[in-house]
Amino acid sequence: MRKYSQRHIPVMVREVIEFLKPEDEKIILDCTVGEGGHSRAILEHCPGCRIIGIDVDSEVLRIAEEKLKEFSDRASLFKISYREADFLLKTLGVEKVDGILMDLGVSTYQLKGENRGFTFEREEPLDMRMDLESEVTAQKVLNELPEEELARIIFEYGEEKKFARRIARKIVENRPLNTTLDLVKAVREALPSYEIRRRKRHFATKTFQAIRIYVNRELENLKEFLRKAEDLLNPGGRIVVISFHSLEDRIVKETFRNSKKLRILTEKPVRPSEEEIRENPRARSGRLRAAERIEKGGD
């Protein structure tokens, strides 16, 4: 595994525990175990509960295994997409769980680890895969998709409403793109200088988000899992989802609202406290929604 020294700080840990309400003998499914921060906090808070942690990223799973090794009798980790969580639970002989946690953010390791391609801060290969066994990379997408399709992806997934076509055109003109800085250059050339100055975040943030979402099928996977999630919960079991942009949050909100088997616990998304944002600026865009499984609607 590559060198990595920066500590990942899990977002809204207090709120996660408050809404999940983990108890002894209960099973929590951590769908995005990442580096294990939330799972560790839950296991420390609740000495008798059990964690089933899953992630598609084999490298962060190794970090999680190290972080959770003292809880190895209560924490089981698996490399699998949360999209297939129902299959995993069936294989384990677990009919239903008592809590589901999803933290949809990119981990510090993915951002700061070498050669993952998620960052625009330094030169890396254009990868952006969370599952390193997947064949679709950002480089493949950027160099092979038609300009119109790239524009659609940047418009829809990056919410780049005004400049998606210009960015797509510059990407095509700059082909082949091989590194993250090649993509940054194309975006810089596409945007007017006043627009670059006006943006509060890095000017390439939206484009990187769009390509990452497309490469990893993030929205499709989220929709597919949330449709099944209510049937994986015992009555009284809770699902907690932390999202980091409006596309994800909208999917979570609408799924909870349309469900006949879930009672919404958060009418509005819960945001991190000012104190947490000061300590962990990446938490700023986090939005937490929670719901509880009810008997109504049947199985």
UniProtKB/Swiss-Prot annotation:
* E.C. number(s) listed in UniProt: 2.1.1.199
**Which is one Pfam family of this protein?**
Methyltransf_5
Q: Region (Disordered): which ranges? A: 268-299
Q: Where in the cell is it found?
A: Cytoplasm
- Specify the domain of life of the species encoding this protein: Bacteria
The UniProt entry's GO CC annotations, sorted and at most eight, read: cytoplasm
Q: Which GO terms describe its molecular function?
A: rRNA (cytosine-N4-)-methyltransferase activity
The record's annotation in InterPro entries points to: RsmH, SAM-dep_MeTrfase_MraW_recog, SAM-dependent_MTases_sf
Q: Which CDD domains match?
A: AdoMet_MTases
In which residue ranges is the amino acid composition biased (Basic and acidic residues)?
268-282, 289-299
Q: Which keywords describe this protein according to UniProt?
A: Cytoplasm, Methyltransferase, rRNA processing, S-adenosyl-L-methionine, Transferase
Catalysed conversion reaction = cytidine(1402) in 16S rRNA + S-adenosyl-L-methionine = N(4)-methylcytidine(1402) in 16S rRNA + S-adenosyl-L-homocysteine + H(+)
Specify which residues bind S-adenosyl-L-methionine according to the UniProt entry for this protein. Answer: 36-38, 55, 103, 110
Any Gene Ontology biological process: rRNA base methylation
Q: Which HAMAP family match?
A: 16SrRNA_methyltr_H (MF_01007)
What family does this belong to?
Belongs to the methyltransferase superfamily. RsmH family.
Q: What is its biological role? A: Specifically methylates the N4 position of cytidine in position 1402 (C1402) of 16S rRNA.
Protein's UniProt name? Ribosomal RNA small subunit methyltransferase H
Species, as recorded? Thermotoga sp. (strain RQ2)
